[in-house]
Every structure is written in C-alpha cells, then in structure tokens.
C-alpha cells in the first residue's frame, strides 16, 4: 500500500468520470494491480426520507439506485483491466435489503439491488478469477447513523436480542473485510456475509419471552 499514490475524487454516477478515475490511478501507479476493491458508497437525496415512500420522485429514486447500487457494476466495468488475478471486491449492505426497517426507505431497495449485483457480478467475473462478496453489518454508531430517528433504541434492541447479546463495531466489520480480502476466503464468492452478532437469524425477540 505504501506504493500507492494519493487520493482520487470519483463521481460514480457517470461512465466517463469512472473510466478516467481508473485510468488516472493506473497512470500514477504504473504496473500496480488492484488486489482488493472495497465499494462503500451509499447515498439518497434527503427528499427520499422527508416524504412517504409512495410519493418519492422518480429522479430521486434513480439517484439513490445509481449511486448506492449500480455504481458497483460501473466501478468493476472500468476496473477490470487493472484487477489482479484472484482479486476480491467487497461491498457493504444492510438487513433492510430483505426486511422492513422503519425510516430506511428507498435505501432498502438500493441495498437489495446491490446484493443482486453482487451475485450477478460474482458469476460473470468468477471465470476470470475475480471474487465479489457483500458484508451485511448490524447497526453501528457512525456519523451517518446519527441521522436515523431512534437509532439509540435500535442499538438497545439489537443488544438485547442478538444471540451474542451485543452490538458489532467497526473492528468486527474490518475483520470480516480482511478475511474476504485475503486468500483465506479464496473459495467464497457471490455471498452476503452477515456481521451482526447473529441478529439476522432471529425472528421472535428474546425480550418478548423474557417479559
């Protein structure tokens, strides 16, 4: 990593800017191949959360899907010439892709699409020796999470009901990312790995039984 030069801005909503991003990376780092590509991009316009989902504008839905989901395909399309043999791409999703989470709105659809892209791209890139997986993390206290109404109550609920009786943190996700990035996971592709202290396997909250 010490050989990699600089930071490069990227507008993932456009083909041209994405192509230029990887071309510039290659130009500034001649001979360097990409072993690991981490796609940690998510965005939806504020208006997607300020009104009922039935009334979200098409343009705002398209923006959320383009940046949060379709950008994975766009990035890999232009990264392909620069990927090393056996490369690993990792993207970040959330349990709202398969179940209702209040206030998550259009991002639920974006995360569901992102997981579909993970499977599709894994199948298309697998014959070329490239792996694609996603990590579905439990709720973590981040700057972005501060804008979610009732987030502290969500953390309390998960801690009380997850099989491990705790919330996960950045180090849990980092550890799984490291594993997916390494040869230790060489036989894993197209998967969604849940890092949530086991919360995603539960149905009836333990707190109900304990009441």
Whereabouts are the PLM-identified features?
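Catalytic loop of short-chain dehydrogenase/reductase
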Residues: 42-81, 85-127, 139-141, 199
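Short C-terminal tail/terminal secondary-structure segment
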Residues: 178, 189-211
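Short, small/polar-rich loop/turn modules that mediate ligand/substrate recognition or access, typified
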Residues: 126, 131, 188-190
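Conserved mid-core alpha-helix of short-chain dehydrogenase/reductase
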Residues: 17-20, 63-66, 70-78, 119, ...
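A glycine/serine/threonine-rich, flexible loop-to-helix segment
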Residues: 127, 137-162, 202-211
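Conserved SDR Rossmann-fold cofactor-binding beta-strand/turn motif
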Residues: 131-141, 181, 194-196
């Amino acid at each position: 990593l010490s050989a990699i030069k600089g930071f490069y801005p990227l507008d993932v909503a456009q083909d041209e800017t994405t192509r230029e991003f990887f071309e510039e990376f290659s130009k500034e780092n001649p001979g360097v191949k990409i072993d690991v590509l981490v796609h940690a991009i998510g965005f939806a316009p504020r208006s997607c959360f300020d009104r009922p989902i039935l009334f979200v504008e098409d343009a705002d839905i398209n923006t959320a899907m383009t940046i949060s989901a379709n950008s994975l395909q766009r990035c890999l399309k232009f990264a392909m010439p620069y990927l090393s043999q056996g490369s690993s791409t990792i993207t970040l999703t959330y349990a709202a892709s398969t179940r209702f989470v209040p206030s998550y709105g259009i991002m639920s659809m974006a995360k569901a699409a992102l997981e579909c892209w993970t499977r599709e791209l894994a199948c298309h890139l697998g014959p070329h020796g490239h792996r694609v997986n996603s990590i579905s993390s439990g709720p973590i206290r981040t700057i972005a999470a501060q804008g979610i109404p009732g987030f502290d109550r969500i953390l309390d609920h998960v801690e009380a009901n997850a099989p491990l009786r705790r919330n996960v943190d950045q180090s849990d996700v980092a550890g799984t990312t490291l594993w997916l990035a390494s040869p230790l996971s060489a036989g894993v592709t197209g998967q969604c790995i849940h890092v949530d202290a086991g919360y995603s396997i539960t149905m009836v909250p333990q707190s109900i039984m304990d009441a």
